[in-house]
């Protein structure tokens, strides 16, 4: 497919509207809304360290797990606060799948189009992050879990602004998720696989090179079995690392510690 399919209007005003902010221990947490793509507004948090910068930046994109209280932009609040103490600015965004009923509302007939729109929204989020005072575009980490990891790969394959990626429990192909529901059979399933193949992360992850990638997987993940995870990792170019945890799809505190240390090294952050 033509990369022009991913075009978006990066010159459109972000129309940032502050909601509130609070400061403690030299760190400011701001809440805002902004103009995403396709006439949608999204909510976000920004963690700002004290000082004038330049600040390394991190874009956090949450997972989808309707039963989990952190299946939204709050997922990485504690991690982002810790990163601010290390000198990094972070943006934590609302997504299409912040709606807990999103998966059941969607259909295979619309998944390709909606996926293109999601990539455009992630690019707008990057615009917002890099528009923050003091943001350093040369030290930019992308952190995504589940759909956040998968769509982050597609985004990075067409817009290489992040300088490193931490990809958490992503599965290599969108039909791995989207064929769960609603049920379709036979030729419809194969036609859907062919349509989504143009977006599948496993065929786009090599496009993130030369940015370093950390892949994180749980050995007991019912959605991302070991063979899928290993195939995803194998498709990426160097530099890359893979880390396994005795956990399910939500990963673990050990995974968070590993990820923080890895980002700290790649963004050249200071210890808190």
Predicted features and spans:
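N-terminal cap/lid segment of alpha/beta-hydrolase-fold proteins
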Residues: 9-52
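Short beta-strand/loop motif that positions the catalytic acidic residue
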Residues: 208-209, 214-217
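Cap/lid segment of the alpha/beta-hydrolase catalytic domain
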Residues: 64-120, 176-180
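Acidic catalytic loop of the alpha/beta-hydrolase fold
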Residues: 219-224, 250
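C-terminal catalytic histidine-bearing segment of alpha/beta-hydrolase fold enzymes
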Residues: 234-272
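Short alpha-helix in the alpha/beta-hydrolase fold that links the catalytic acid
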Residues: 225-233
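Primarily recognizes the serine-hydrolase "nucleophile elbow" in alpha/beta-hydrolase
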Residues: 123-183, 187
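Short beta-strand element of the alpha/beta-hydrolase
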Residues: 44, 54-65
């Amino acid at each position: 497919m033509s990369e022009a399919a991913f075009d978006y209007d990066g010159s459109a005003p972000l129309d940032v509207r502050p909601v509130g902010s609070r400061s403690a221990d030299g760190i400011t947490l701001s809440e805002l809304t902004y103009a995403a793509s396709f006439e949608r507004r999204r909510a976000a948090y920004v963690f700002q360290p004290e000082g004038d910068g330049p600040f390394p930046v991190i874009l956090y994109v949450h997972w989808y797990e309707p039963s989990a209280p952190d299946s939204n932009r709050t997922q990485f609040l504690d991690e982002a606060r810790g990163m601010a103490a290390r000198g990094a600015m972070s943006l934590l965004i609302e997504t299409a799948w912040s709606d807990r009923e999103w998966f059941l509302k969607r259909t295979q007939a619309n998944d390709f189009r909606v996926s293109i729109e999601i990539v455009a929204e992630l690019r707008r989020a990057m615009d917002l992050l890099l528009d923050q005072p003091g943001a350093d575009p040369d030290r930019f980490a992308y952190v995504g879990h589940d759909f956040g990891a998968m769509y982050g790969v597609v985004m990075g394959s067409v817009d290489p602004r992040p300088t490193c990626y931490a990809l958490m429990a992503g599965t290599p192909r969108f039909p791995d998720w989207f064929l769960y529901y609603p049920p379709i059979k036979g030729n419809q399933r194969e036609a859907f696989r062919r349509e989504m193949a143009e977006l599948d992360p496993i065929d786009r992850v090599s496009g993130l090179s030369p940015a370093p990638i950390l892949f994180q997987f749980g050995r007991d993940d019912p959605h991302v079995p070991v063979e899928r995870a290993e195939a995803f990792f194998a498709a990426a170019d160097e530099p890359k690392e893979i880390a396994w945890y005795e956990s399910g799809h939500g990963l673990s505190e050990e995974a968070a510690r590993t990820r923080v240390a890895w980002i700290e090294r790649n963004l050249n952050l200071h210890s808190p």
